[in-house]
């Protein structure tokens, strides 16, 4: 998303843009997402939820998102208010329609090519390194298959500084699923379950966060990056559970009633990356946007699409000055 946003905004400002996409289609992981672009309603809540994140970047995203959403709708794609979470506010877009609108505004996308040959001004926006992180830790991938971190490597080679983190945004999944099921198949009901590992230890007895991202990372730390959700009879009646159980791939009945469901940690995007300022500038002639920019959500969870949208705009605007 961030690369398309940056290209669209740069063209709007009169710049000539070369847009390179490593994959065989535009849209990156945005196309596989729920399409909700959101922020916390209150900035202090943002800080409470993501206490280890870069505060100036957090404030930039929080302050600019609403006008950025208006800009996005100005491209001809309609969003609907997203109000189901009392902590957050945002808009939901159809991912396919959003991708199409951004591609039309961004111009020609050269597919199958990850970077230009020349060393001119460059905006890097490649979706972080979820594939690399998942492969190194034996976890499932819940992102596009191309985000391996080469964009971050390129920015670092051109003088950028690293913003390291081993955190990620992910979900508990029932096992490998087709990418079109990444959202629907997420086993997002761990707060109603007893969470145990393969030797029966309850590894996460604490209260689970609203996003369950903390639980996904705790599952990743278990042997094999997997765990069991043990659900009692009452939990099985909850609509949040009933909607997700059809996607379960391995279940076992519990003695005395109930069910346990096998889950695996899956990585959507990483939190580490390149250090940027509030103009998305990483080095002389290099801007980094989206989740290639590290350090925004550390210690919690915030919208990766909001980060992509705001930093994509900031990168284009600064690069075009």
Can you say where each PLM-predicted feature lies in the sequence?
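N-terminal Rossmann-like FAD-binding beta1-loop-alpha1 element of flavoenzymes
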Residues: 1-19, 315-316, 320
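An anion/pyrophosphate-binding glycine-rich loop and adjacent beta-alpha core
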Residues: 158-252
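Conserved N-terminal/central alpha/beta ligand/cofactor-binding core
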Residues: 22-107, 194-209, 243
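Glycine-rich loop(s) and the adjacent beta-strand/alpha-helix scaffold that form part
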Residues: 124-175, 305, 311-314
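Catalytic phosphate/nucleotide-handling subdomain of diverse soluble enzymes
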Residues: 284-321
């Amino acid at each position: 998303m961030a690369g398309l946003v940056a290209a669209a905004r740069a063209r709007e400002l009169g710049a000539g843009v070369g847009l390179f996409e490593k994959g065989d289609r535009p849209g990156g992981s945005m196309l596989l997402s729920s399409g909700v672009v959101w922020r916390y309603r209150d900035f202090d809540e943002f800080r409470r939820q993501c206490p280890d994140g870069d505060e100036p970047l957090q404030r930039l995203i929080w302050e600019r998102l609403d006008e950025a959403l208006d800009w996005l709708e100005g491209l001809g794609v309609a969003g609907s208010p997203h109000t189901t979470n009392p902590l957050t506010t945002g808009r939901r877009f159809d991912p396919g329609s959003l991708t199409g609108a951004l591609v039309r505004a961004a111009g020609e996308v050269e597919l199958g090519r990850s970077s230009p040959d020349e060393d001119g001004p460059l905006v890097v926006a490649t979706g972080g390194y979820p594939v690399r992180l998942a492969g190194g830790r034996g976890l499932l991938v819940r992102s596009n298959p191309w985000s391996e971190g080469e964009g971050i490597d390129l920015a670092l080679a051109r003088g950028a500084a690293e913003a390291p983190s081993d955190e990620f945004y992910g979900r508990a999944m029932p096992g490998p699923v087709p990418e079109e099921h990444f959202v629907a198949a997420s086993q997002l009901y761990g707060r109603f379950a007893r969470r145990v590992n393969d030797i029966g230890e309850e590894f996460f007895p604490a209260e689970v966060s609203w996003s369950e991202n903390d639980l996904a990372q705790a599952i990743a730390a278990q042997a094999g990056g997997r765990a069991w959700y043990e659900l009692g009879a009452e939990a099985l009646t909850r609509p949040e559970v009933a909607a997700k159980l059809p996607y379960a791939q391995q279940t076992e009945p519990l003695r005395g009633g109930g069910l346990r469901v096998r889950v695996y940690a899956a990585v959507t995007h990483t939190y580490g990356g390149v250090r940027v300022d509030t103009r998305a500038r990483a080095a002389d002639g290099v801007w980094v946007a989206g989740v290639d920019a590290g350090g925004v959500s550390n210690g919690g969870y915030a919208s990766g699409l909001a980060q992509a949208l705001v930093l994509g705009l900031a990168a284009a605007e600064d690069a075009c000055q």
